[in-house]
From Swiss-Prot:
Database matches in NCBIfam families: PRK09194.1, proS_fam_II
Subunit structure: Homodimer.
Keywords per UniProt: Aminoacyl-tRNA synthetase, ATP-binding, Cytoplasm, Ligase, Nucleotide-binding, Protein biosynthesis
Source organism of this protein record: Burkholderia multivorans (strain ATCC 17616 / 249)
Name under which the protein is recorded: Proline--tRNA ligase
């Protein structure tokens, strides 16, 4: 490719609405341009990187035995009504009517459509396993699209759906996709972690997220540096921090805590560690035709509630936070001084695992400006229902017993789910088993955010000059910068020769023949993030040298002119082989 025949739309300044590095750099590098909120044009530079991501994804999906198809972006409402997601999905699902007043959606995912394919095409266990995938544009009507392609409304996604006859087959399909994802993100040149996750609105009973590690990531990941353990903080098991409950050493005492409604303030006033205080959180579950059930969840003062874990407890699937009116009715006091002793009406108490092993702790007295110290289970309170209801923290013991938890930030770029029969039972997707009996198909679904990968890769790979692409997804692998291409025959001939040699070697190279000043050329290609640069100048050619600089290098080096193409081609191949 020659730059004079390409489109390079670099900008010196980022738009005012760009908040994060990837959004700023994708606009400045001429990769994207905004059309509407969360909707972008992908300019030639950006599209080249997208196509490279798609190629790697497609190769690894095919290698794993998946079969490519293409499903419509527009889907009839009837399919979503069958699955139950027409009512469940919410305003993110873009709905519209055609001229005949039929309801349709623009698909954010394709579980319903692919299940419809399967129920009409798969009749026997002999036709499974099968895994269909596509790479297609999706639409999710985000309430607040932001961060460029990281949280857009329209995006490109690879979504795959496996169908198996039994649980063993589903586990094998899931393993193949998990392994394929590891290969994909490794080939993309990204630092990533696969983490155990909650299945969210897709549903199902087992899932992993793939996160690109970046300080700007929206998701918190708990991992163990000395083992393979990693999980979304929402899903990570929090072990009890106290192995055994100590015997009571203090008497039950009501203490004045005027104006101290927070655990930190109470601990400071009483001159005790925050870890001896209890955070009381009041939840409610509604009962048709009767008053709600009120729950008191007890956490250690330095811990935070994990609502996803709570929602999985018996009776708490549809919980909500209690209103202040309900709190006063059940506890006799507003929030800030709540506790399990002396409630006005019965409440159900759940203690976090760590709280269940505490002794001589402090709780609210259910009276403004008072707490109770020296509280102990068994003596002052009945033994509680115990559950893991908190988020893990840095330093907690790893659930695999191999060290301590650390926390990092990640950007989710892939997700794999074992759906089981969630959609096949709802939509009647059955097959005849070996004995001729109809059985529901077992499904898995597997997504990769193709356009999101670009933003995530930039968040992980940039400096003050611009993007630093991994070779595998860079719009070009090598850029040739000739000094005076339009003025010097020697420079032009050397640049054209290098271009021909690199092209023949299969290297994705661009020759900057625009006639720009060196400073402009260098700034453009550093901003765009091409991994390798060769500078051809008359002075160097007289000495038989060509200047080379890798995008991550701080200094340039001189290469023999006759060896420059082979040397750089080998650098590219070595990087792609990692």
């Amino acid at each position: 490719m020659k730059a004079s025949r390409f489109f390079i739309g670099t900008l010196k300044e980022a738009p005012a609405d760009a908040e994060i590095v990837s959004h700023k750099l994708m606009v400045r590098a001429g990769m994207i341009r905004r059309v509407a909120g969360g909707i972008y044009n992908y300019l030639p530079i950006g599209l080249r990187s997208i196509r490279k991501v798609e190629a790697i994804v497609r190769e690894e999906m095919n290698r794993a035995g998946a079969v490519e198809l293409l499903m419509p972006a527009v889907q009839p409402a009837e399919l979503w009504q069958e699955s139950g997601r027409w009512e469940q999905y919410g305003p993110e699902l873009l709905r519209f009517k055609d001229r005949k007043d039929n309801d349709f959606v623009i698909g954010p995912t394709h579980e319903e459509v692919v299940t419809d394919i399967a129920r009409n095409q798969i009749k026997s266990y002999r036709q499974m396993p099968v895994n269909f995938y596509q790479i297609q544009t999706k639409f999710r009507d985000e309430i607040r699209p932001r961060f460029g392609v990281m949280r857009g409304r329209e995006f490109i996604m690879k979504d795959a759906y496996s169908f198996d006859k039994d649980a063993e087959g589903l586990r094998e399909s899931y393993r193949k996709m998990y392994d394929a994802y590891v290969r994909i993100f490794t080939r993309l040149g990204l630092e990533f972690r696969a983490v155990a996750a909650d299945s969210g609105s897709i549903g199902g009973n087992f899932s992993h997220e793939f996160h690109v590690i970046a300080d700007t990531g929206e998701d918190a990941i708990a991992y163990c540096p000395s083992s393979e353990f990693a999980a979304n903080v929402e899903a990570a098991e929090a072990l009890p921090l106290i192995a055994e409950r100590a015997a009571p050493a203090e008497a039950l005492t009501k203490v004045a805590t005027p104006g101290k409604a927070k655990c930190e303030a109470v601990a400071e006033l009483l001159n005790i560690p925050l870890e001896r205080t209890i955070k009381s959180i009041v939840l409610a579950t509604d009962n048709e035709g009767a008053e709600p059930t009120i729950w008191l969840v007890m956490l250690r003062g330095d811990h935070d509630l994990n609502e996803i874990k709570v929602s999985k407890l018996p009776g708490l699937k549809n919980h909500r936070f209690a209103t202040e009116q309900e709190i006063v009715e059940w506890f006799g006091t507003p929030p800030g001084y709540l506790g399990p002793i002396g409630t006005k009406k019965p409440v159900k108490v759940i203690a976090d695992r760590t709280v269940a092993n505490m002794s001589d702790f402090v709780v609210g007295a259910n009276e403004v400006d008072y707490h109770i110290a020296g509280v102990n289970w068994g003596r002052d309170l009945p033994e509680p229902e115990v559950a893991d209801v908190r988020n893990v923290k840095k330093g907690d013991p790893s659930p695999d017993g191999k060290g301590a938890i650390d926390i990092c930030r990640g950007i989710e770029v892939g997700h794999v789910f074992q759906l089981g029969t969630k959609y096949s039972e709802a939509m009647g997707a059955t097959f005849l088993d070996e004995s001729g009996k109809p059985q529901p198909m077992l499904m898995g679904c597997y997504g990769i955010g193709v356009t999101r990968i670009l933003g995530a890769a930039i968040e992980q790979n940039f400096d003050d000059k611009g993007i630093i692409w991994p070779e595998s997804i860079a719009p070009f692998e090598v850029v040739l910068c000739p000094m005076g291409y339009d003025r010097s025959d020697a420079v032009r001939e050397a640049a054209d020769k290098l271009y021909a040699e690199l092209t023949a070697a299969g290297i994705d190279v661009i020759l900057d023949d625009r006639g720009e000043r060196p400073g402009v050329m260098f700034a453009d290609w550093e901003l765009i993030g091409v991994p390798h640069r060769l500078v051809i100048g008359e002075r160097g050619l007289k000495d038989g040298k060509i200047e080379y600089q890798g995008r991550r290098d701080t200094e340039a080096t001189l290469l023999p002119a006759g060896e420059a193409a082979a040397t750089v081609a080998e650098k590219v191949r070595a990087a792609l082989a990692h």
